[in-house]
Amino acid sequence: MSSNDSAQTRNLQEERFNERTSTPTVVTAVLPDTNGPTTNSTSGSVGPPHPTPNVPVPTQSSSDPPSASGIFAKEIDLPRNVIQHSGNKFILDVVPDSRFPTFAITEFVQRSFSNFTFEQYSYVSPASLVGYLVYMIHAFVFLVDAFERSPMSAYASEIDASHAYLRIIDAFSDAYIPDFLFEILDTYLSHRLDIRSKLEMNVSYGSVLYKYDAPRIVAPSIFLLAHNQLISQSRESTAYEKWLDSIVIHYSRAVIRVGNLVGGLYQSSHGSTTTHFTYRNWFARSLSRLADSATHRTHLRRPMISEFDYNIPSVNNNTYNPYVHLLMLEPNNRNITLDFIRSLSSFCSTELKATRTLRDHISRRSAAISRCVIKGPEAPTWHSSPLDDLKEKSKQGNFSQFCEVAKFGLPRKENSESYTFKFPKDASTIDTAFYLIQENGRSSVLDPTTADEELHTEGMNLLFDPYDDESSAHYATVLSGKLIQNSNIDGETLLLPDPTTGLARTNSRYLQGSVLIRNVLPEFDQHEIRLFPRYPQISRLSASLTLLFNMRQVWIPRFKQKVDEQPKLSNFSWNEGCDGTVPSLNVVTAESSTNGPAAEQQVILWSSYRHVSNSDRPTVDTVYYYSTLELLFGTRSSMMQTYNLHQLLSLH
């Protein structure tokens, strides 16, 4: 045995000894007390108290194992001869796609606003009320991050460390919110798994990266800009377009407008001529009613209405903090943010009869956070292409034209043939069976699916539930925006238990089913998206892939010149005709490649469920997206099929 082998054996034996001599951890199926610490802060900030949870927690199955009363039970004495370990602490962050609750909130406001007496509230309009309710969703996420997640994320820590934010935090903690919003917030309550209680699921923006998430996390500021547009003296017919043209944020050198974030405005340039187009996707169609000509006409006649003095923030990758932007905590926006919260809270208390606040809600617990929607590829409701100032009335756009600008669902690009591999034609020089180049090889049969309005706006969805198969339990799931949108991942691997590995590691295999987002294509960074489809699942539902020796790597053999016998290459399929225009490899790993970094980000995935591997600001090398939760909860989980929210909830 080599010295390396003996060292490894000693380490394993020492690890087993340490586990055996430590106090055994008894794991039960009943959640431990979830009251949490009084504060999760080192700055002394107070924040919401932690009331006793009043949501039922998961309990053991009715089919509990029988008691140890067998013939040899006393001699075997398992309680004294079994080592237990509940695993290491692990935080799974949940980032809702807030377009979906925003869609529902907008419809709620549209259907009810005319019943309210709003003239005496100068900051209240349909747009500002929608913005307020969306703001409270982001405020709830922050409060859970700051006072329930332990440790709090780096983004939350930056805010918690400054007393300048305390007045605003207190204001939104005590602001009044209608009961309707709690139907959505209840699906964001924290949860610990029953058996694996060291795994905690918390709603948090601690993993958010601007180029991956910005258009899916709706900024309340866009509704303040819509409110301002309603009282402008511009022509009614251009009010909606002027709102789409409004600047929301400067990110690095990019000017991001409302039209970028909701996909309602794009442009096409030919020579020196630039033409703007408006296009109403399902999201923009809902929001357009907040700033259309009819709404503009109604509120322009109000005797008392005030403009929000919103200052456009400028950030870059190093300074962007989603909580600062979404909660409008910039120094030059704090006063107007306080006025906004207090005015809309008073309105909700008086007109909507709201009596509940976030302060008393964040410490509750529910397994509903693990329910989500699973989607296939969908057309974006945004684009990151530049928008010039709108100077003339726009033209009517369409789906195909918008997808070209958004670079979604593009056809296969032409092979430029700009690089030629060397190919030794002398058969005595090389064994061609082991050479990866084909002379005059055939073209690939792989072809991407191009953008299709019906397929990519009205495709069916799946509802995932790890605990139940009751369809009515998913009413709030479809509103919540908790989703996994997967375009090209066809399967994930599961690291199998190994008795020679420490028990703590074995019971902490929580990253199974996740993808390091260094491998994922950013959606808001002008990347071309080609939808090479997954293979049909007909006749292969029982298919499996088994990885030997090391599941963290994919081995491509590099043989010595002199070998024991001629090797047989099997258990793989040739991907014929690779030419740089089609995928050449169909595997990505979190491990650093021994052959250099990945040439491209080819995974097309967005997931609400993430993990950040350290306590610093997130980066593409520390954030993992979960492409499935089945490797955490098992395939016993329930799957149901349903339609999109914009098909289920009609606009009034």
From Swiss-Prot:
Keyword line: Capsid protein, Virion
Transmembrane segment boundaries: none
GO cellular component, one term: viral capsid
Compositionally biased region (Polar residues): 1-11
rRNA-binding found in the keyword field: no
Residue ranges with Low complexity bias: 34-47
Region annotation Disordered: where it falls in the sequence: 1-70
Compartment list: Virion
Stated role: The capsid protein self-assembles to form an icosahedral capsid with a T=2 symmetry made of 120 subunits.
Name assigned to this protein: Capsid protein
Native species: Atkinsonella hypoxylon virus (isolate 2H) (AhV)
